[in-house]
Swiss-Prot record:
GO annotation terms (biological process): tRNA methylation; tRNA wobble uridine modification
Keywords, alphabetical: Cytoplasm, FAD, Flavoprotein, NAD, tRNA processing
The keyword Ribosomal protein is assigned to this record: no
GO cellular component: cytosol
Compartments in which it is found: Cytoplasm
Gene (name only): mnmG
The protein, known as: tRNA uridine 5-carboxymethylaminomethyl modification enzyme MnmG
Swiss-Prot/TrEMBL cofactor(s): FAD
GO MF terms, alphabetically ordered: flavin adenine dinucleotide binding
Length: 624
């Protein structure tokens, strides 16, 4: 191996969504950083759906933005349709989603990386890790070059021993058009990591010129479009519609006829697929009572005719793909430009990680993204950001940034991964968060911007803007608590409409706004000032007032849980020597090796009684 003549603080392996955030975070925090990618033309490529956000995923993007990451800004600059989902539900589950111009998204992110100080980009395939005295110190590449780094971040996506399946045909690939990484998995196994196998898939890309869109239902975005980033004032690019289509009984018969040549159902694919993003053949087999399945026909960009049929991923043979796509109403003459396929790949069970995303097996080595068993661009980007931050903090000799389950969806996800591991592709849902009323999209900046600024990621201008917003919220809350509606001065129509005609005592505007039938627009009939403040401030004030009781209750729950989360469990604790623990509990604790009592309490089979025993043992140990 030829040693490269420059050593780095942080080396990031992989240029997908996790790798981009990791590299940018480390470089922006002042670390000399190297990003290695098998293909520099595929930086931040959207391998599957051309969209960012969605339920719970939008929360992750907002949190990435609040901490100083790039994903939200990138989609704001390249999005071609923006929508807020769940608008008729409570604020905890409302979510942002945007269609992306796939090529513009990739190209802009590459430009950001290329112009970032202290960041080098190189095209290379990493084949092995260089480990000395239990710590990683560099990586070796297929071209025979060795790159040395104080910390290494692996963000390998689906590339490790990737195997693509189309019907009974299969061939090595990291994704369609890219070669796999064939040596790194072996190197990880030699280091002592447990490496598993997962599977995912993607639909065909269709020629939009061969689709009769007049026979499909159009779906338009919000007008005006609402940006993801707290620093984006407005979306300026042109917006386009998506279209809705449906499979039918004929489609399902065609799919069933091809199952004998499906790698999924013939036993060829061994990897576990994503539970919450099943292939179309999986849907047809698992839900035989359904006579149709919905698909969104999504444009891949404004300068291409390619479209993405969401929800129709498959690994069926190409002739079956031709037939079933053409069985859909409006798609009878459709041409496939790129076939659908499934891909198997290696991953490393994240139970082998600390909450910082540093591995427990090898020091100074961090894992982020699909290597940890997750699925989705947003999940990957969030992990990449945290891995990049913590690698930089390690180089700087500082404590890692650990987000708790009460801090962010990012914290929920990482805690799930490192506490429970992953045997199937992990996807974020709002239902995974026990404090979801505290972890809303709208308050991500209030929760995390201070942390991002403290570590040097949030720029000064953005921080001043955040602080001004925060002050305005506090001032408006204070004003609404003080200003009152007096019975003698009340508007009769307003009073009658909201059942206040018998009111004897004055009511503060806060008390009025707390009522479910009065929102800020209604309050503006008697309080003109409330409509003069920015919409984001007004939204935050209204949510805090209307949901204060529920928020206070969740804050009490957080405080009770905080004691468990702060109780550290030493890595060398011998569970076998603790009296009172059952054999099952000992086995679970030995297997999962939790870092805190909080983590231990979330391991299935570890009882409250066992946590009490552990707590007593830790107090006794610390007292010695």
């Amino acid at each position: 191996m030829i040693a490269y003549d420059k050593s780095y603080d942080v080396v990031v392996v992989g240029g997908g969504h996790a790798g981009c955030e990791a590299a940018l975070a480390a470089a922006r925090m002042g670390c000399c950083t190297l990003l290695l990618s098998i293909n520099l033309d595929a930086i931040a490529l959207m391998s599957c759906n051309p969209a960012i956000g969605g339920l719970a995923k939008g929360h992750l993007v907002k949190e990435i933005d609040a901490l100083g990451g790039e994903m939200a800004k990138n989609i704001d600059a390249t999005g071609i349709q923006f929508r807020i989902l769940n608008t008729k539900k409570g604020p905890a589950v409302r979510a942002s989603r945007a269609q992306a111009d796939k090529q513009q998204y990739r190209l802009r992110m590459k430009r950001i990386l290329e112009h970032q100080d202290k960041l080098d980009l190189k095209q290379a395939e990493v084949t092995s890790l260089l480990v000395e005295d239990g710590n990683v110190v560099g990586v070796d590449t297929k071209a025979g070059v060795r790159y040395l780094g104080k910390t290494i971040i692996l963000t390998t996506g689906t590339f490790m021993r990737g195997l693509i399946h189309i019907g009974l045909t299969h061939y090595p690939g990291g994704r369609a058009g890219d070669l796999p990484s064939v040596g790194l998995s072996v190197s990880l196994e030699e280091c002592g990591f447990k490496v598993g196998r997962l599977k995912t898939g993607t639909p065909a890309r269709l020629d939009g010129r061969t689709i009769d869109f007049s026979r499909l239902e159009p779906q338009y975005g919000d007008n005006p479009p609402i940006p993801f980033s707290f620093s984006t004032d407005k979306i300026t690019q042109s917006q386009v519609p998506c279209h809705i289509a449906y499979t039918n009984e004929r489609s399902h018969d065609i799919i069933r006829s091809g199952l004998d040549r499906s790698p999924l159902y013939s036993g060829i694919i061994e990897g576990v697929g994503p539970r919450y993003c099943p292939s179309i053949e999986d849907k047809v087999v698992r839900f035989p009572e359904k006579d149709r399945h919905q698909t969104f026909i999504e444009p891949e960009g404004v300068d291409t005719v390619e479209v993405y049929p969401s929800g129709l991923s498959t690994s069926l043979p190409i002739d079956v793909q031709w037939a079933f796509y053409r069985s859909i109403y409006g798609l009878e003459r459709v041409e496939i430009m790129r076939p659908a396929y499934a891909i198997e790949y290696d991953y490393v069970d994240p139970i082998q990680l600390h909450a910082s995303l540093e591995t427990k097996v090898v020091g100074n080595l961090y894992h982020a993204g699909q290597i940890n068993g997750t699925s989705g661009y947003e999940e990957a980007a969030a992990q990449g950001l945290i891995a990049g931050i913590n690698a930089a903090l390690r180089v700087q000799g500082k404590e890692p940034l650990i987000l708790g389950r009460n801090d962010a969806y990012i914290g929920v996800m990482i805690d799930d991964l490192v506490t429970l591991g992953s045997k199937e592709p992990y996807r974020m849902f709002t239902s995974r968060a026990e404090y979801r009323l505290l972890l809303r999209e709208d308050n991500a900046d209030l929760r995390l911007c201070e942390k991002g600024y403290a570590i040097g990621l949030v720029r000064e201008e953005e921080y001043r803007r955040f602080h001004a917003k925060k002050n305005m919220i506090e001032e408006e809350l204070q004003r609404l608590r003080q200003e009152k509606l007096l019975p003698s001065e009340a508007d009769d129509v307003f009073m009658e409409e909201f059942g206040l005609t018998g009111m004897q005592n004055a009511m503060t505007y806060e008390q009025l706004l707390r009522r479910p039938d009065i929102d800020s627009r209604e309050l503006a009939r008697i309080d003109k000032h409330i409509m003069e403040i920015p919409a984001a401030v007004r939204e935050q004030v209204e949510i805090q007032i209307k949901y204060q009781g529920y928020i206070d209750r969740q804050l009490e729950q957080v405080e009770r849980a905080r004691k468990l989360e702060s109780a550290k469990i030493p890595g060398d604790l011998e569970y076998a020597g603790l009296p009172g623990l059952s054999a099952e509990v000992r086995e679970k604790l030995q297997q999962f090796r939790p870092d805190t009592l909080g983590q231990a309490s979330r391991i299935p089979g570890v009882t409250p009684a066992a946590i009490t025993i552990l707590s007593i043992a830790l107090k006794a140990r610390n007292g010695r």
